[in-house]
Amino acid sequence: MSITSMEDLKNKQAEVKKNLDGYTCRVLVCSGTGCIASGAQKIYEEMSRLCEGIEGVAVEMQKDVPHVGIVKTGCQGLCELGPLMRIEPYDYQYVHVQVDDCREIVEKTVICGLPVERLFYRHNDEACPHPSDIPFLNQQTRIVLENCGKIDAESIDEYISVGGFSAMAKAFFEMTPQGVIDEISKSGLRGRGGAGFPAGKKWSQVARQPEKVRYVVCNGDEGDPGAFMDGSVMEGDPYKMIEGMVIAAYAVGAEDGYIYVRAEYPLSVQRLRMAIEQAESYGLLGDNILGSGINFHLHINRGAGAFVCGEGSALTASIEGNRGMPRVKPPRTVEQGLWGKPTVLNNVETYANVPKIILQGADWFHTIGTEGSPGTKTFSLTGSIENTGLIEVPMGTSLRHIIY
């Protein structure tokens, strides 16, 4: 199916929502790298096997036969407690799930709607049935990670069902390229890769270059030891980052983009490839996107494990097939980046913020974080601390609050 207009996108969203509403129960199995390493794939397979035969079990228990969906999601955040599972519509959060627990989950929760209480997270010896009951989760503000752990990480339909690509459509049909840049500039969004350079200023510098060929590049080479924020976004909601890149390309007049992913992220590469293929099949990437006349082609480039390739000029050199070596600046990438052309280079988290800003507006973004740096920041917590995992908190949150 090709989506060739804003109306088509709205119709597709309604269709997918209707299909999802038809499920009486959805089992969300965390399938981020951490949970997969803990055995989540076997749990997914066992739940799928048991739910295939659920009709016989339900009849035996004299219960109505539920319509069940088994879903692979991205990271659900509580990485030290994996494998993790959420059950909709009850919003139960299970931790330390094992294959031997699956039958009980099906019989009690999937069929009867009852909790398996021993699988709940416990805080100060009190059970926390729902994510909203867990202090580690309920104190977060999620923009970048809002879909991670909630939608199928391998389904573009589920991304569309939660408003996916609506921001892109709004940018194309309701805003000029300069209007997009102005909104990003007004939002105060800063690059989330470390330097904190204003994203709108960078886009504006590329847009005003006389050279007509321009590129949009995403830095997914997350090389800091123990960091897995960008990897979790690429694994859990690759579509949001892709949508942000398309909006950036529209704003600066680019028709080609590259995602540079570190070699140690094979699952990210796999899901990004799936996401790109699905978007192309729907007409949401490629030529004449949404019937707008706008073209944007997206490519994946795998790094070779060199830490230095996280630096912008080294990264672009690596994409070009050269040795990844930083160069003296100026010129900067906004002037002469990939193949000597003006290039927007932001990281995964920066692009993932863009769709929400376009939809909700710069003023909304300013209500979160600090005056000088609005919005949120994702962090991966590792080491000898109380909670390890993935979080997203407003800018200005103290390290003491995050760690302890």
What does each model-identified segment do?
Residues 169-210, 367, 392:
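Accessory "access/gating" subregions that flank catalytic or transport cores
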Residues 31-39, 80, 184-206, 305-317, ...:
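Conserved phosphate/anionic-ligand binding catalytic regions in large, soluble enzymes, centered on
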Residues 31-36, 90-91, 256-269, 273, ...:
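Conserved short loop/turn motifs at secondary-structure junctions
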